[in-house]
Regions:
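Predominant activation on well-ordered alpha-helical scaffold segments within soluble catalytic domains
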Residues: 6, 54, 157-160
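Short linear loop/turn motifs
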Residues: 22-25, 136-146, 174-186
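Short polybasic/polar patches that bind polyanions
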Residues: 10, 58, 164-165
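A local structural motif
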Residues: 10-30, 40-43, 169-173
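Pocket-lining segment of extracytoplasmic ligand-binding domains
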Residues: 20-23, 33-125
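Secondary-structure end/capping motifs
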Residues: 90-170
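Conserved C-terminal helix/tail region of periplasmic/extracytoplasmic solute-binding proteins
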Residues: 161-204
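Secondary-structure junction motif
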Residues: 1-5
Length: 204
């Protein structure tokens, strides 16, 4: 979120610094805190993932100025990756493969019944957090998400490059080898689904 916001501001002629300088003050904070501060009029805007973006619109009267999906090729960019340590992967490949099989099966179940899956996720959020999303927030947020086994590797590299450009890192981090999609592609092939690419950032 921080990188995406600063990058967009820079592209439109605004300046920010990681120490709070520039002509736009960017204050990194939790999504929940952002909602509270926006309701109180203490912040003017926010760059948020779902369901927080929908909550700001529906619960606090915010207006969408930029939909990040419009900034990426085909509207696709990564927000969440499933990760394990290299040590764990090497020591327990069968467990990792079983985890991936579950993730791919869940992806297929969501595609087969998106509305039922949406409602199940809403119930799980309530059970895990004790907080219930309103039906309107849940429906709107879900409509803006795409669940996929594709890591969309090119978007991770682009974000890393942007982080350096806006001063969050001194230089673009070396992401070589960050992906090992070998087991994932085995699971996808066994499921009759297309394999996915590491975008030159690791094994496939």
């Amino acid at each position: 979120q921080d990188v995406a916001l600063r990058s967009w501001l820079s592209a439109h002629g605004y300046t920010t610094t990681v120490t709070g300088g520039g002509n736009v003050l960017v204050a990194p904070q939790s999504n929940a805190q952002t909602l509270s501060l926006f309701k109180a009029g203490a912040v003017d805007g926010a760059w948020l993932p779902e369901p927080w973006a929908s909550r700001l619109r529906l619960e606090a009267g915010a207006t969408t100025l930029v939909d990040e999906a419009t900034l990426w090729p085909q509207g696709r960019f990564v927000t969440t990756n499933l990760v394990v340590s290299t040590t764990y992967l090497q020591a327990h490949p069968e467990q990792v493969k079983a985890l991936l099989q579950g993730a791919v099966a869940a992806d297929a179940a969501i595609a087969a019944d998106p509305e039922g899956s949406r409602d199940s996720v809403g119930s799980a959020i309530t059970a895990l957090t004790g907080a219930k999303l309103s039906t309107q927030v849940l429906h709107e947020a879900w409509s803006r998400l795409t669940i996929t086994p594709d890591p969309i590797a090119s978007s991770l590299q682009a974000s890393a490059t942007a982080a350096a450009a806006v001063g969050i890192t001194k230089s673009p981090p070396d992401l070589s080898g960050i992906y090992d999609l070998t087991l994932l592609n085995q699971v996808l092939t066994a499921s009759g689904r297309p394999t996915v690419s590491a975008g030159g950032l690791g094994k496939e």
